[in-house]
């Protein structure tokens, strides 16, 4: 086994070479049927694998010779305890590794898939979202810089549409549809899953849209690099850093990231207001309602709202006879 790992004896496929070939092919498909964010994920995996192999095996690359899960187990431990990555990030890297190796096996590049029966399931993190009161604090709160104001607007737009950062950044005017009665809708395809979704613009979202449109022109020209883009969106890293400053200034005691806007739409804006789970799932562009259930945590407020909606109706349909108490003495 040691000889196989170090590449002695029979000629075996090298793991990092396999990753390089995969990334090279993947890069040619970016903006066709793959995204740059996914490519970066695989490139990050390749970097972490290189560091791990050098640290643990004292070589620049290793071969995939025999089915052996110990490598995957050690790599998982390295990501968690040496790199200090979060559970969900570790899970993503392991899935990416398994995908590359499985593809090589299916294409006949390697004889066996050493990670076929290895699984790592991350604990589901607590979903962070804004309450109704916190949304109002964010809307009326004072911010110090123009970029903070713009980042807040972008975050709030996603709170009231359910868009992810990636879908907001690519949003163009072809995806904005106006019905004969004057209502605006977003009709697009999710960049991550390629699933079609449609969502109506609520008043706050419409107000933000109008704010970034030039009055004399139907199309927003703020985005000089691509004039068809609806909003001038900063990078995700910059937006997340800016959000930390904004919530402090608005008196919100939460460590927000941009994706919390999508969680807020799923919980506070829709499910807590009685929108059925299946409908929310369609608006979010989820393939399965089970994904929506993870985003939309049931809270006591949701339970109370649901009961309140049927309380009067049940009271009219079913009446239990009351008895008068007899006087004592």
What residue spans do the PLM features occupy?
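N-terminal DNA-binding recognition helix of tyrosine site-specific recombinases/integrases
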Residues: 37, 44-55, 70-73, 81-116, ...
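Basic, Lys/Arg- and aromatic-enriched nucleic-acid-binding interface segment
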Residues: 87, 91, 110, 115-165
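Conserved tyrosine-mediated DNA breakage-rejoining catalytic core shared by Y-recombinases
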Residues: 125-128, 134, 170-210
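Catalytic-site neighborhood detector that most strongly recognizes the C-terminal catalytic loop/helix
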Residues: 129, 190-194, 236, 284-309
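C-terminal catalytic core of tyrosine-transesterase DNA break-rejoin enzymes
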Residues: 156, 160, 166-167, 245, ...
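Short, polar N-cap/turn motifs at the start of nucleic acid-interacting alpha helices
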Residues: 175-181, 253-254, 274-294, 305, ...
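C-terminal catalytic core of Y-nucleophile DNA break-rejoin enzymes
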Residues: 191-210, 220-245
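C-terminal secondary-structure termini that scaffold catalytic or DNA-interacting sites
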Residues: 216-219, 225, 310-329
